[in-house]
From Swiss-Prot:
It is a multi-pass membrane protein. One of its GO terms (molecular function) is chloride channel activity. The chain crosses the membrane at residues 28-48, 50-70, 213-233, 239-259. This is Voltage-dependent anion channel-forming protein RSc3414. One of its GO terms (cellular component) is plasma membrane. Keywords: Cell membrane, Ion transport, Membrane, Transmembrane, Transmembrane helix, Transport. The keyword Transcription does not apply. It is found in: Cell membrane. It comes from the Bacteria. PANTHER family: UPF0187 PROTEIN YNEE (PTHR33281), VOLTAGE-DEPENDENT ANION CHANNEL-FORMING PROTEIN YNEE (PTHR33281:SF19). Belongs to the anion channel-forming bestrophin (TC 1.A.46) family.
Amino acid sequence: MVVRPHLHWFRMLLAWRGSVLPQLLPRLFLIFCISLVAMAVHVHWLPITVNLSTTPFSLIGIALAVFLGFRNNASYDRYWEARKLWGQLLNDARSMTRQALTLPRETLAAADVREFVQVLGALPHALRHQLRRTDPRDDLSARLPAPLFERVMASRYRPAALMLWLGEWVRQRSREGSLDAWAVLAFDRNLGSLSNVIGGCERIVSTPLPFAYSVMIHRTVYFFCAALPFGLVESIGNFTPVFSVFVAYAFMAHEAIAAQIEEPFGTEDNDLALNTMSLMIEDAVRDLIGEPSLGDEAAARAFILD
């Protein structure tokens, strides 16, 4: 996730890190070369050519802009829904920690509360690895008791295994008489909300935008940008490469941004900063029981949070 202070309008023009321009440079160079070919064909090799009007390109460009707008909106909806789900995860984790501290009839043993908070703090890390399909071993082994760690690693769905343990913790406190029925109901409501968060994230990961829709827009963008110089060369001559590259940047950048944020749990610069948010959630619940901060592990690296 790109996190930068508000930039002056001129510095914004020169921003490089976090922009999609670096990955587009080879493609824009290709459009530049095609523009030179169009100029050479028009001026030197085929002085008598069929003049292409810019009208068809204008109509196609308008339609393509509308399609790209729909694509970007669909991608941003997925991105924003993912961010709201992780915000809800933070709220639920804080609520459950507060309940563990305030709802029991008598104050629970510090070790019991600390174990509960440790497992709750490990949940976002387990979810992050589940969504990114990475190995959670290092993160979970440092946060979970050995028996629970082995149990979680043996499960296919590690966040669900941690949720099961949290439910068992509530059941055990209820059997001991520390929690009454209303307190158990309050815990269960937040556990249900956490389950909805996990399920919502898994839904986003397992349901991409329709491939046929994405490939249709992708092909149209690149065919349009490759053909555009041949439609402009008659009217603007030597300025064809400049305008062709600029128009290509506008269309290709929109498509590249949509492709990045379509999968919000990835590791590209404009994806959600799940590492940072996992540490933030863990730090938030630790703070409620007086545990020290995790430190500045989540500091931005060249304005990029991962």
